[in-house]
Amino acid sequence: MTGLQMRGHAAMLLFSILVAGSFIFGVRIANLAEPAAINSARFIIAAILIGIYMLVNPNIKTADFAPLRFKPWRYLLLSSVFVSYFIFMFEGLKTAATVSSSVIFTLIPIMTAVLGYVILRHIITRRMAFALLIGSIGAMWVVFKADISNLLVFNVGKGEMIYFVGCVFHAAFIPLSRKYNCGEKPIISTFAILIVGGVIMAIFGYEGLLAVDWLNMPAIFWTGLLYLGIFASAVTFFLIQFAALALPSGKVMAYNFLTPVWVILIEVALGLGWPPLLVSAGIILAVIALLLLLKDETKIPV
């Protein structure tokens, strides 16, 4: 494994932790404003933060922005794909059950691996396929809290189908990011995607933005929004752009398997108690899957 690949894995490990934190904060502020307003604001905050960072960073030169002039439509495409995930998520979650949507989310690594082959011809080895399979099973086991009764209420309705389409967009973003990178530094491409994505989200959620009483929102709202904007948007977008250039698509999104695990550990740290002991079986499967994916191989494809 090369140093770049090791940094790619480290980036996605941090990514999975930060995304887990976004679920914790997201639950606490979800009912305080329209989802479209919250996500529009997080894009704007993230873009401003990265813009300031690039402005004061002596290592970012004017010449680094030159590749953006080459086929600028790439960023309209990439931003539209990523924002589409949020739009379909908003619509789908209006009627989709929480458990059902969580299960669909755990399928993103498999979707990403398949789309990585279609778009980039990234080979899916037997080891990778096996790791993705047991990782999905482990993540679902955690989502269902090792309770068969939760599995029995799983239902695929209109909301679930809409959310599934959104997850396909999410999965496609990784291989498309690599395909349409023309030499930009990850921080530059992240900034461009956030700017264009922020405009698209603002157009989609302008009614929600205008409806929020920004000056009188509680402290927890601003704490959660700043976390989402800084850590779950600016930092995670950069991490995923960096990892997409260092690792195969399936390996990048496989770190989503760890997100339910981190959510549990964060909840325990907050004093919300441990889940049933049987849930640990799912955690073990997720860890095994990631260990299998750490091995770099180019042997017989599936």
Protein language model annotation of sequence segments:
Residues 1-41, 88, 152-179, 199, ...:
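Glycine-/small-residue-enriched transmembrane alpha-helix faces in small-molecule transporters
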Residues 4-8, 32-36, 40, 66-71, ...:
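Juxtamembrane helix-entry segments on the extracytoplasmic side of multipass membrane proteins
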Residues 32-84, 111-112, 169-176, 190-209, ...:
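Transmembrane alpha-helices of multi-pass small-molecule transport proteins
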Residues 49-54, 108-133, 261-281:
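C-terminal transmembrane-helix exit sites in multi-pass transporters
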Residues 39-41, 99-107, 176-199, 230-269:
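Helix-helix packing/entry segments at the starts of transmembrane helices
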Residues 10, 43, 221, 257-302:
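C-terminal-most transmembrane helix of multi-pass membrane proteins
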Residues 50, 124-146, 201, 257, ...:
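Hydrophobic transmembrane alpha-helices of multi-pass small-molecule transport proteins
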Residues 18-23, 57-101, 105, 141, ...:
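Specific transmembrane alpha-helical segments of multi-pass solute transporters/efflux pumps
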